[in-house]
């Protein structure tokens, strides 16, 4: 299909100093868990975006020196020749598809804890990092106040890193000053308390950054386009950088040294104000700030705001708010987003849902990222998975999939892409499984994009292969139904449900009196069904670390109920990693929801629950003989009155159908069945991203020797003395 001519402006080349970006799509720097020690992963993941039409593709934050070692988080480095060699794999792959490659020069100050290098960073003043106190970080980290000699040494570290980036082949060198990193700590009065010529007035606080840009420009000349990433407002009011004060003044002051501005808002402790989750922030949520940048510079501007909608992209470019569409998460969800716009396939875009699960993996530290929408993200190199290309089927075995949730619908989509005849059966009115329920919770409406993408693709694939079928609103299938169905391969994707009796991870037993068959006790599924009345006083018993309990609390508080949450773990603790945590806590406070932390439930009765502090038995331990606990009896139990109890304790796989079929394996051959598989939550409850991955994986590997269990993937391993597998080809090999 041809591109809609309305979008032509998005494909207009633009000069960036000595370089030219071929269109207006710019993958801003973002972490992916590869660093420089997994060059294959980095090369393949970034390269697929260049293939997909992103005109410029950047590294993640790239440490310039051991002083800014960001371990425990995995990030790139450009310290030496070895790093250059590993990064060159990405550069060459990006260039092979006609895109520019960019390197973001990172110096974190105390925000980079240097756990591996054990060095101390330098900064304008001494301060301890507010970022280092978030979950997953190692307590407080401090820097050293730089004297003039150390300041100049730091500037030279930037220059040396810029030269290494140029010699690696990068087209763009980006001095990272957003998210309270590097030069922003000198500009920002929140950090800079100096009284010499590098502190105090605006001109003095801007001096370090300006001098650094001058020195880099002299060193690299016009060999690269020079970029700086800048937070134009740190959202701290007069205590930080404000847009209409230091923000625009700095844009004007630094513009002569730059070829491109990469702008955003916020700091690092709450960088979800920039990488805004869809729960709180819509597309283009930074525009109230970014729309003013062009008045202070004549240089091109790239801005972000989770741009996933081509119409919104067109709007902001035509309005002159920004010149280039910057994106991280939308480029992860769909590496081919620009190409699909170019080819007139807008409805094929795999839209970012804004859940920030990708970010959560980096926030946890040490793990490669994942994507809820795109199961191939991070798997391109090690598994050879291309997001848009698939191996043709290797047999004529048709497949019956029972359950059209995240795992089942993704498995069906990929199998149909490969040419298999698939029958997808579900009891619900729509595909998507429990995503349909989750998307009804406050702020989570855009999570329905996960369902919508798969539904659209399945409908298209049905037209290509009329023998395929999607059967919705069906009665639950039995083992007899499946044995008689006639499919060669059977995939059970029946999902999971919340425990109806309060079984939880601390006791692995039901909570006495907790019984969701009673009118005053509900599971989340029963809340979604809406068949049970909910009383004025709602008590949520929470043993889960993610979104369900806080979302239900918000739902009922907004509806006028008095809500209390008794929670064993931090309420929505995992949401700290998805950058939803701070605003969720503000919202909980604003709505008057009462949170009882470190609190378990020992009994449920009509009209009340018995709660206890989980540490109430005291710390002293002694051996008291068989049948006796080593600590004192917990005496902190108290009764709390309520009208309705909601159990958010644990999820249990709905695997009865799978186990019945396995028990009747002797009947498979006579009924033409060769394999029965179980995937997604039906195998083990997990987040949507991992359930989707599991369905995708089975569809890719269904002809392998043991498809139920994933095949080994290619590891990027440093082995002592020799390669881990000397016969293994290190090149990227697509399974297409």
Swiss-Prot record:
Gene3D superfamilies in the cross-refs: Aldolase class I (3.20.20.70), FAD/NAD(P)-binding domain (3.50.50.60), NAD(P)-binding Rossmann-like Domain (3.40.50.720)
SUPFAM superfamilies attached to this UniProt entry: FMN-linked oxidoreductases, Nucleotide-binding domain
Ligand binding (substrate): 176-179
Cofactor note: Binds 1 FMN covalently per subunit. Binds 1 [4Fe-4S] cluster per subunit.
GO MF entry, a single one: 4 iron, 4 sulfur cluster binding
Entry binding sites for ADP: 398-427
Listed EC numbers: 1.5.8.1
Catalytic activity: dimethylamine + oxidized [electron-transfer flavoprotein] + H2O + H(+) = methylamine + reduced [electron-transfer flavoprotein] + formaldehyde
Binding residue positions for FMN: 229, 329
Active site per database record: 181
Keywords for the protein's UniProt record, in alphabetical order: 4Fe-4S, Flavoprotein, FMN, Iron, Iron-sulfur, Metal-binding, Oxidoreductase
Pfam family, one: NAD_binding_8
Name listed for the protein in its UniProt record: Dimethylamine dehydrogenase
């Amino acid at each position: 299909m041809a591109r809609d001519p309305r979008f032509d402006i998005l494909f207009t080349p633009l000069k960036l100093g000595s370089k030219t970006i071929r269109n207006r799509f710019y993958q801003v720097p973002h972490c992916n868990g590869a660093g420089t020690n997994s060059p294959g992963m980095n090369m393949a993941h970034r390269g697929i975006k260049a293939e997909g039409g992103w005109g410029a593709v950047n590294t993640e934050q790239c440490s310039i020196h051991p002083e800014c070692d960001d371990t425990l988080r995995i990030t790139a480095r450009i310290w030496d020749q070895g790093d250059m060699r590993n990064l060159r794999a990405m550069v060459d792959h990006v260039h092979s598809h006609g895109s520019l490659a960019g390197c973001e020069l990172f110096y974190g100050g105390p925000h980079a804890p240097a756990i591996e290098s054990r060095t101390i960073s330098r900064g304008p003043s001494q301060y301890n990092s507010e970022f280092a106190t978030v979950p997953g970080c190692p307590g407080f980290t401090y820097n050293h106040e730089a004297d003039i000699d150390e300041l100049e040494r730091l500037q030279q570290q930037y220059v040396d890193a810029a030269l290494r980036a140029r010699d690696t082949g990068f087209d763009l060198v980006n001095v990272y000053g957003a998210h309270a990193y590097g030069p922003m700590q000198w500009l920002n009065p929140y950090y800079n308390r100096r009284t010499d010529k590098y502190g105090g007035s605006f001109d003095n606080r801007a001096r370090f950054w300006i001098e650094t840009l001058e020195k880099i420009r002299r060193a690299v000349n016009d060999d690269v386009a020079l970029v700086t990433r800048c937070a134009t407002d740190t959202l701290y009011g007069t205590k930080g950088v404000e847009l209409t004060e230091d923000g625009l003044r700095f844009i004007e002051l630094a513009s002569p040294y730059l070829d491109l501005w990469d702008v955003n808002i916020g700091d690092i402790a709450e960088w979800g104000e920039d990488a805004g989750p869809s729960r709180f922030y819509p597309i283009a949520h930074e525009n109230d700030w970014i729309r003013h940048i062009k008045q202070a510079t004549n240089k091109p501007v790239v801005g972000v705001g989770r741009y996933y909608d081509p119409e919104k992209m067109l709007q902001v470019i035509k309005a002159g708010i920004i010149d280039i569409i910057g994106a991280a998460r939308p480029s992860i969800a769909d590496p081919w987003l620009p190409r699909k716009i170019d080819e007139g396939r807008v409805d094929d875009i795999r839209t970012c849902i804004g859940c920030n699960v990708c970010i959560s993996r980096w926030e946890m530290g040490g793990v490669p990222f994942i994507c809820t929408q795109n199961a191939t993200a991070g798997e391109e190199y090690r598994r050879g998975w291309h997001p848009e290309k698939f191996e043709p089927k290797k047999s004529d075995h048709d497949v019956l999939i029972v359950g059209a949730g995240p795992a089942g619908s993704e498995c069906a989509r990929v199998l149909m892409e490969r040419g298999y005849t698939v029958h997808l059966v579900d009891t619900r009115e729509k595909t998507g499984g429990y995503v349909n329920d989750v998307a009804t919770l406050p702020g989570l409406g855009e999570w329905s994009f996960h369902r919508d993408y798969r539904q659209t693709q399945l409908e298209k694939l049905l037209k290509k292969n009329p023998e395929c079928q999607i059967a919705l609103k069906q009665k639950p299938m039995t083992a007899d139904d499946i044995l008689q169905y006639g499919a060669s391969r059977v995939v059970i994707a029946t999902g999971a449900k919340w425990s109806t009796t309060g079984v939880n991870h601390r006791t692995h037993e039901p909570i006495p009196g907790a019984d969701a068959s009673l009118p005053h006790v509900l599971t989340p599924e029963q809340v979604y069904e809406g068949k049970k009345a909910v009383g004025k006083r709602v008590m949520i018993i929470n043993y889960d670390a993610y979104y369900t309990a806080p979302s239900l609390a918000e739902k009922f508080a907004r509806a006028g109920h008095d809500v209390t949450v008794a929670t064993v773990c931090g309420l929505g603790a995992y949401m700290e990693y998805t950058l939803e945590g701070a605003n969720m806590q503000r919202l909980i406070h604003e709505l008057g929801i009462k949170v009882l932390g470190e609190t378990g439930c020992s009994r449920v009765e009509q009209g009340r629950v018995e709660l206890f502090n989980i540490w109430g038995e005291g710390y002293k331990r002694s051996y008291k003989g068989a049948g006796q606990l080593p600590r004192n009896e917990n005496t902190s139990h108290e009764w709390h009155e309520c009208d309705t109890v909601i159990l958010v304790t644990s999820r249990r796989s709905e695997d009865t159908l799978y186990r019945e079929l396995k028990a009747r394996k002797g009947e498979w051959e006579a009924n033409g069945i060769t394999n029965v598989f179980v995937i997604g939550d039906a195998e083990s409850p997990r987040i949507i991203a991992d359930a989707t991955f599991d369905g995708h994986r089975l569809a890719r590997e269904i002809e392998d020797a043991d498809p139920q269990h994933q095949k080994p993937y290619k590891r990027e391993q440093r082995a002592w003395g020799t390669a881990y597998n000397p016969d293994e080809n290190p090149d990227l090999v697509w399974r297409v």
